[in-house]
Structures are given as C-alpha cells and as structure tokens.
Amino acid sequence: ITRDHHALLWINPHTSFYFRSELQMVSDEGLDAYGAVTWGQFFVYQGFNRTAGWMHTSSGVDNIDEFLETVVKRAGRYYYRHGSELLPMQARTITVLSKTATGMARKTFTAYSTQHGPIVRKLGDKWVSVSLMRKPITALIQSYSRTKAGDYAAFRKIMELHSNASNNTLFADSKGNVAYLHSN
C-alpha cells in the first residue's frame, strides 16, 4: 500500500531480476501497456495499461484432468475404450535430435493421444492421458486482449474465454475495482 493508501500490484516478486523483461508495448490499434513478458511472447503477461493492471499467481488448484484409458491393440493399431465404444488412438511420429560425442543423433518415436489429450505415461495396465489448456489460439487471444481491457467489465468478458489454465489472476482498475479470478 502506498502512503496515500492505494494498492500496488507487484510484478514477479518471486523471480530473479533477469527472468522476465519489462517493457512498454504501444500500437496504433489502442495498445498501450507496460509490464513483464516472457521470452517470445508478443503480449504483456502481467502489467498495466492506462486504467487497469493485472498479475498472476500460481497455486495448487485443480487445473489439469487425467484420464485412465483402457487400451486395446487390434490389427497393429491402438484403440481406447470410451463408454461402450472402441475409438482409434491418434498416432503421430516425432523425431528428436540430440548432440552426441560423434555428432547428431536422431530418435524417432510414436506419440499417442485420445480425445482427452496426449498419453503421458502408463499406470498398471492403463494409459494415462491429460487434458490441460487444449485451446492454444484462444489462450493467445485472451492473453493479448486483456492488455487492452480498460476496466473490470471488459477484463471479465475477456476472462470468460477460460484459457488461462494454470494461473490465478489479480486485477485492479482506476474505478476502484479489485478482483481475484481463481485458476482462470
């Protein structure tokens, strides 16, 4: 709190000074925001514009779902049980390059996924798929759009996209509105 009893939103008190850069972003389309960005982001992740500020906290909220998949192999393909149906798993070949003492090595493997998300491990005889932020374009839209929100009503409308999957959000505007959005 300032000496005049105004709230402050601190950016990144938990990270080192060099973890995130802080900058101002201005455009002819109405963007004028200052704050912290992470490498490669084209939006202010947490910061403020002329009338509003936002920041994020992390917590142990339930923001990921895991599914135990019953997997069956038939005719060289994997299927998973969904209700009373067997649905085909999506399979994708991925090649990873790595440096070795004699040069570059390639390792190719198959990644599987269901409608719930990618398979990440095996638990007993079940395969485990995870569902977390499966809307990357919507997440980018939400992250960029909130930099232009001038008040709580506009910010809340943007947050209705529900694609900021791993953080809680704190918000304050020049009208005196203060909000906490839990794992949005």
Named regions from a protein language model:
Residues I1-N184:
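Mature extracytoplasmic enzyme cores
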